[in-house]
Amino acid sequence: RPSFCNLPVKPGPCNGFFSAFYYSQKKNKCHSFTYGGCKGNANRFSTIEECRRTCVG
């Protein structure tokens, strides 16, 4: 799994309202969160399938 999968969820400082997914290392699963639309980090996926394929295996 790529190292960015272990980054904490980071919604970013902007006020957008975008549905996204992140990988939780603690639970070894992908969860939804609301992304603000800017900044954040690489542990952010458009679909749960993409998150699972990249980080869960």
Swiss-Prot record:
It comes from the Eukaryota. Keywords: Disulfide bond, G-protein coupled receptor impairing toxin, Secreted, Toxin. Disulfide bonds join 5-55, 14-38, 30-51. One of its GO terms (molecular function) is toxin activity. It is found in: Secreted. One of its GO terms (cellular component) is extracellular space. InterPro entries: Kunitz_BPTI, Kunitz_BPTI_sf, Prtase_inh_Kunz-CS, TFPI/VKTCI-like. Residues 5-55 form the BPTI/Kunitz inhibitor domain. Its main location: secreted. Interacts with vasopressin V2 receptor (V2R/AVPR2), probably in a selective manner. Inhibits vasopressin binding human V2R in the nanomolar range (Ki=13.3 nM), and also moderately inhibits vasopressin-induced cAMP production (IC(50)=453 nM). In vivo, intraperitoneal injection of this protein into rats increases diuresis by 4.5-fold, without any loss of electrolytes. Belongs to the venom Kunitz-type family. This is Mambaquaretin-3.
